[in-house]
Amino acid sequence: MEQTVMAGAEPFRMEGNETGILVSHGFTGTTQSVRPLGEALAAEGFTVAGPRLAGNGTAMEDHAKTGAPDWIRSIEEDLAWLEGRCSNVFFAGLSMGGMFSLYFAGVRPDLIKGIVP
């Protein structure tokens, strides 16, 4: 069944220079909470990705059916996008997004050059 994403909760990607920054929202949040940071970073020239974590920004029933493996996959898609165009990748996260910045710094130290949890 197709999920309807709330207006403003869509994932975002903004092309810039070779420094990429992934910004992740928190538990039950959406990209609305991190989009202003993403836009400010993009305005400074950075390449920015803001994934919508699976089950967020749709219906609570969708969120109830998702968990950490789903959210990790959501982030991995945007990390792969950044890795394909950036020589340095950083990760900033709000709340649970901050926890994921620590997680990915541990499992992908070859990719993540710094974090802002």
Predicted regions and their residues:
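Active-site signature of alpha/beta-hydrolase-fold catalytic machinery across serine-
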Residues: 103-107
